[in-house]
């Protein structure tokens, strides 16, 4: 009888201990708290800098970073790295090489996003693919849209400026034949094929214009290493057919720094 009583007391003691452990706040709730905290961790991050103060538990947006449109490729502001360049050919098809700000450091150029139709330009490379620069404005390369784009843009740009157009027609039309006309001396260009016969496309300041191909006896530039022409602000054309750029004969005895190169017969 005493043995049965002792066994019963043991069972009661074990049951009490189990009940006490099951009701302990640290043991009974710990698993639930861990699960809740883990599942809501992303929602309870502190707000970003510049966020509203006093709301530490506000949700963090999962939207991607803001795109920076002024560089060689669309990148987030945090990752944006401007790509330095010396000429347009070093940039992508939808970019051009120029100083980032007007009046900025003239010695620093980066690849900038191309300009869309009806935006101002100084050369063809500034306009996005499918457009080209005409009279300082990016217009469509499609001949069917050429006349309408120019007329509409000129009307919008100068239609309300009476002092500028005093004595002149408010609407200017351009013949579609101009689309096929090769650039003359001084015209903006992208490559030599844009210029008329006897001209080449060469750098002039930070743009390119059509310049005369050099003739016999004219001063030329001899490039000692490949790619050095990209550093010239006032680039010369190449020598004409049958000519090459050589040191002028009467300057053979001069110092290396003062040697003069001219276009001479082979």
From Swiss-Prot:
Annotated coiled-coil positions are none
Which tissues show it? Placenta.
Q: Where is this region: DKK-type Cys-1?
A: 85-138
Using the UniProt annotation, give all residue ranges assigned to the region (DKK-type Cys-2).
Answer: 189-263
Which compartment or compartments is the protein found in? Secreted
Gene Ontology BP terms: canonical Wnt signaling pathway; cell morphogenesis; embryonic limb morphogenesis; endocardial cushion development; endoderm formation; face morphogenesis; forebrain development; hair follicle development
Q: According to its record, what are the GO cellular component terms?
A: early endosome membrane; extracellular region; extracellular space; plasma membrane
Q: Name one GO molecular function term.
A: co-receptor binding
Cysteines paired by S-S bonds: 85-97, 91-111, 114-128, 121-133, 127-138, 189-201, 195-210, 200-237, 220-245, 239-263
Q: How far does the signal peptide extend, from start to end residue?
A: 1-31
Q: Which residues are glycosylated?
A: 61, 256
Q: Name one Pfam family in it.
A: DIKK1-2-4_C-subdom1
Instruction: List the keywords (alphabetical).
Output: Developmental protein, Disulfide bond, Glycoprotein, Secreted, Signal, Wnt signaling pathway
Which Gene3D superfamilies does the UniProt entry name for this protein?
A: Lipase, subunit A (2.10.80.10)
InterPro entries in the cross-refs: Dickkopf_N, DIKK1/2/4_C-subdom1, DIKK1/2/4_C-subdom2, DKK1-4, Dkk1_Cys2, Dkk1_N
Description of its domains:
The C-terminal cysteine-rich domain mediates interaction with LRP5 and LRP6.
Q: Which family does it belong to?
A: Belongs to the dickkopf family.
Q: Supply the PANTHER family for this chain.
A: DICKKOPF-RELATED PROTEIN 1 (PTHR12113:SF11), DICKKOPF3-LIKE 3 (PTHR12113)
How it assembles, according to the record, is: Interacts with LRP6. Interacts (via the C-terminal Cys-rich domain) with LRP5 (via beta-propeller regions 3 and 4); the interaction, enhanced by MESD and or KREMEN, antagonizes Wnt-mediated signaling. Forms a ternary complex with LRP6 and KREM1. Interacts with KREM1.
Tell me, what does this protein do in biology? Answer: Antagonizes canonical Wnt signaling by inhibiting LRP5/6 interaction with Wnt and by forming a ternary complex with the transmembrane protein KREMEN that promotes internalization of LRP5/6. DKKs play an important role in vertebrate development, where they locally inhibit Wnt regulated processes such as antero-posterior axial patterning, limb development, somitogenesis and eye formation. In the adult, Dkks are implicated in bone formation and bone disease, cancer and Alzheimer disease. Inhibits the pro-apoptotic function of KREMEN1 in a Wnt-independent manner, and has anti-apoptotic activity.
Q: What is this protein called?
A: Dickkopf-related protein 1
């Amino acid at each position: 009888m005493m043995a049965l009583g002792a066994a019963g007391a043991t069972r009661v003691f074990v049951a009490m201990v189990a009940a006490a452990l099951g009701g302990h706040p640290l043991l009974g709730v710990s698993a639930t708290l861990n699960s809740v905290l883990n599942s809501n961790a992303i929602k309870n991050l502190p707000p970003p800098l510049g966020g509203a103060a006093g709301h530490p538990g506000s949700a963090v947006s999962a939207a991607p970073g803001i795109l920076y449109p002024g560089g060689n490729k669309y990148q987030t502001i945090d990752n944006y790295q401007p790509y330095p360049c010396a000429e347009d050919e070093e940039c992508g098809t939808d970019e051009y090489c120029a100083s980032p700000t007007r009046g900025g450091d003239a010695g620093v150029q980066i690849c900038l996003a191309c300009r869309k139709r009806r935006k101002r330009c100084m050369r063809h490379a500034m306009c996005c693919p499918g457009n080209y620069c005409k009279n300082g404005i990016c217009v469509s390369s499609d001949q069917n849209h050429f006349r309408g784009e120019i007329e509409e843009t000129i009307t919008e740009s100068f239609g309300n400026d009476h002092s500028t157009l005093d004595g002149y027609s408010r609407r200017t039309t351009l013949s579609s034949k101009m689309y096929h006309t090769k650039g003359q001396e001084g015209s903006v260009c992208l490559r030599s094929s844009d210029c008329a016969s006897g001209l080449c496309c060469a750098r002039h300041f930070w743009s390119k214009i059509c310049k005369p191909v050099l003739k016999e006896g004219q001063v030329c530039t001899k490039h000692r290493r490949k790619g050095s022409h990209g550093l010239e602000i006032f680039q010369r054309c190449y020598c004409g057919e049958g000519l090459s750029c050589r040191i002028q004969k009467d300057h053979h005895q001069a110092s290396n720094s003062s040697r003069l190169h001219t276009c001479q017969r082979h």
